[in-house]
């Protein structure tokens, strides 16, 4: 008899509250300084362990299941191989986060897969080992594994937990996909922002070095940002396309959401310095 399905493992979105590109390494990767904070909008994953060793992904989104490079499958297979386990898993994905919007949904799904199967397969790796496995899948997978709002340096893998204000955000989702690779390969990208200490960064005006380039080439992002900035301090997350405005109160964000033009989509979310994944793990 198979084990029961372990349900509702959250994979939260993240915002880059600031993002500075401070250099480029010889291997082509970029040096960053950024601040990650989670928001309370999540994908959800269910897991059922099997004894045959097969890893299978189920989703209502056929293109997710058909993608053999899907990060969920990569994460599960990487952990299975690293730990030498013979068990497999059926994985069900409820995809609620926009894809390719700079909210980290794919990386978060991978992180939740590693954290959940580490528990369900009784591997019990330390979180740092999971983060090492996750880093090979993507630079921002480790922050989702650790589950704490963090200041990040290097390519984004050197993490220091911080406690920024947990504000309310109105997140707009422009109907366009921005290629992260294209942005970081562009000769127009600012790559020489001076490195600053964490204390200086936390006290200054926050910005995103990728924003100027993206809004120059993607009018949908430019239009969303120019509309939102009329109501609140606003900027882009990651390499876009999503942009966010920050508010002190939920009601303020909801009031602006109600004014949203019919050609734009968005949602209101709460900033979280502790990922809901940690609470789910505690109840595994």
Swiss-Prot record:
Its EC number is 2.7.1.148. SUPFAM superfamilies: GHMP Kinase, C-terminal domain (SSF55060), Ribosomal protein S5 domain 2-like (SSF54211). It catalyses: 4-CDP-2-C-methyl-D-erythritol + ATP = 4-CDP-2-C-methyl-D-erythritol 2-phosphate + ADP + H(+). Keywords: ATP-binding, Isoprene biosynthesis, Kinase, Nucleotide-binding, Transferase. GO terms for molecular function: 4-(cytidine 5'-diphospho)-2-C-methyl-D-erythritol kinase activity; ATP binding. Pfam families: GHMP_kinases_C, GHMP_kinases_N. Pathway: Isoprenoid biosynthesis; isopentenyl diphosphate biosynthesis via DXP pathway; isopentenyl diphosphate from 1-deoxy-D-xylulose 5-phosphate: step 3/6. Disulfide bonds: none annotated. ATP binds at residues 98-108. The active site is at 14, 140. It is an enzyme of class 2 (transferase). GO terms for biological process: isopentenyl diphosphate biosynthetic process, methylerythritol 4-phosphate pathway; terpenoid biosynthetic process. Signal peptide: none annotated. Belongs to the GHMP kinase family. IspE subfamily. Catalyzes the phosphorylation of the position 2 hydroxy group of 4-diphosphocytidyl-2C-methyl-D-erythritol. This is 4-diphosphocytidyl-2-C-methyl-D-erythritol kinase. It comes from Shewanella denitrificans (strain OS217 / ATCC BAA-1090 / DSM 15013). The gene is ispE.
């Amino acid at each position: 008899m198979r084990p029961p399905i372990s349900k509702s493992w959250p994979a939260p979105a993240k915002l880059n509250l600031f993002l500075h590109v401070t250099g480029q390494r010889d291997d082509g990767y970029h040096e960053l300084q950024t601040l990650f904070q989670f928001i309370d909008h999540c994908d959800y994953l269910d897991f059922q362990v099997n004894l045959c060793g097969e890893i299978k992904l189920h989703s209502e989104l056929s293109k997710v299941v058909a993608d053999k490079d899907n990060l969920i499958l990569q994460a599960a297979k990487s952990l299975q191989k690293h730990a030498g386990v013979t068990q497999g898993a059926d994985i069900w994905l409820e995809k609620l986060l926009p894809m390719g919007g700079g909210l980290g949904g794919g990386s978060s799904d991978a992180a939740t897969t590693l954290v959940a199967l580490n528990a369900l397969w009784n591997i019990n790796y330390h979180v740092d080992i999971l983060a090492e496995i996750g880093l090979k899948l993507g630079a921002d997978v480790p922050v989702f594994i650790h589950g704490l709002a963090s200041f990040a340096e290097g390519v984004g893998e050197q993490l220091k937990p911080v406690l920024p204000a947990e504000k309310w955000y109105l997140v707009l989702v422009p109907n366009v996909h921005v290629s992260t690779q294209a942005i970081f390969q562009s000769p127009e990208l600012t790559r020489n922002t001076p490195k600053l200490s964490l204390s200086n960064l936390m006290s200054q005006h926050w910005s995103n070095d990728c924003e100027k380039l993206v809004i120059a080439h993607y009018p949908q992002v430019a239009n969303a940002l120019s509309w939102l900035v009329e109501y609140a301090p606003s900027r882009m997350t990651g390499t876009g396309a999503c942009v966010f405005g920050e508010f002190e109160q939920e009601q303020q964000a909801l009031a602006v959401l109600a004014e949203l033009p019919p050609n734009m989509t968005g949602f209101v979310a709460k900033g979280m310095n502790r990922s809901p994944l940690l609470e789910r793990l505690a109840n595994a």
